[in-house]
Amino acid sequence: MQKEINKDSSDPGTFIQGRENKVFITGGTGFVGSYIIRNLVEKGHSVRAIRRSNKLPFYISSEVLNRVEWVNGDVLDIVSLNDAMQGMDAVVHSAAIVSFSRKERHEMYHVNVEGTANVVNAAIENKIKRFLHISSVAALGRTIKTETVTEQKKWEENKNNTHYAISKHHSELHVWRGFAEGLEGVIINPSTVLGFGDWHQSSCAIFKNAYKEFSWYTKGINGFVGVEDVAEATVQLLFSHMTQRRYIINAENRSFQQLFNTIADGFHKKYPHREATKTMGEIAWRMERLKEIFTGKKALLTKETAKVAHSKTSFDNAALLKELPNFQFNPLEKVIKTACEKYLQALNSGILSL
């Protein structure tokens, strides 16, 4: 069910752009979560964020981070969640583990599914007015044939779904349950998120591979979006009146080869020039699996990453642009150029290492 909540603007429960709101965020030290925090702080909102360690993202200014009320806790600890959410108006649930490694699978399900259930339950307990869940296009499921995915796509169990996708699908079920129990809010499904961050983690590793002139490419197709666009869409939807809806957040669809070439241009590096076929991928992930078994080192390529690299899926962003008519995505060329410049600056200053 999808609906719009109509509220009188004088209602104190109504969110108004420009008015300070108290927003609680999970995953605030992560790539996407930290940019959401920056967006909220710069718009004048009061932010409280839960974290497991004192380490903060180096790619967000200390001026922004110092304006956040940091609370030690964990999404797997319902007591700390309940305490941290007291007095807040809204919740952005961004905490999640993104992994395609067999070794991290159990923890990923634990955090992504049970953690989301805890956040939803705490939000209901604390009578949170608005709830926004950061999901992923992966939660919509991979397609067997080349096609464009919209918000109407129904989840289907098939061999193309990764365990990460399954965990995000099950986490969404807890959010829909929360909506049925009275929470108001939306789910967003970003595609692969690009930007300046820690290139030893998450999708930022794509930039490190390009900088190191990784020579292989595949002919897979996927959706991509800048991290600042994800943050802006998050904040606009958080303070909208839409509820019980999902929105795909995707700027452009392009091949992995095109993406790698654009990033290589940003670093003035060589293009990848060797095609990794499906057969080669099948052999490579098996060799990596054996190496992982015998050495204990995390596999650089898994069965799931090999599968994703060759899939051809595009994502439709029409629903978001209809809902937010003044919203505009930054072109990927601009996103990548800006990110590459910042990565080079971080390397030269010693903030970032290879």
Which sequence ranges carry the predicted segments?
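N-terminal Rossmann-fold cofactor-binding loop
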Residues: 50-54, 75
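Active-site Tyr-X1-5-Lys
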Residues: 160-186
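NAD(P)H-binding glycine-rich loop region in Rossmannoid oxidoreductase-like domains
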Residues: 64, 68-114, 122
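Substrate-positioning beta->alpha
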Residues: 118, 170, 201-202, 218-239, ...
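NAD(P)-dependent short-chain dehydrogenase/reductase
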Residues: 182-224
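Mid/C-terminal beta-alpha module of Rossmann-like enzyme folds, strongest
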Residues: 233-300, 322, 331-332, 337-354
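N-terminal Rossmann NAD(P)H-binding glycine-rich loop of SDR-like oxidoreductase domains
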Residues: 22-43
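Conserved Rossmann-fold NAD(P)-dependent oxidoreductase catalytic core, especially the SDR/UDP-sugar
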Residues: 114-163
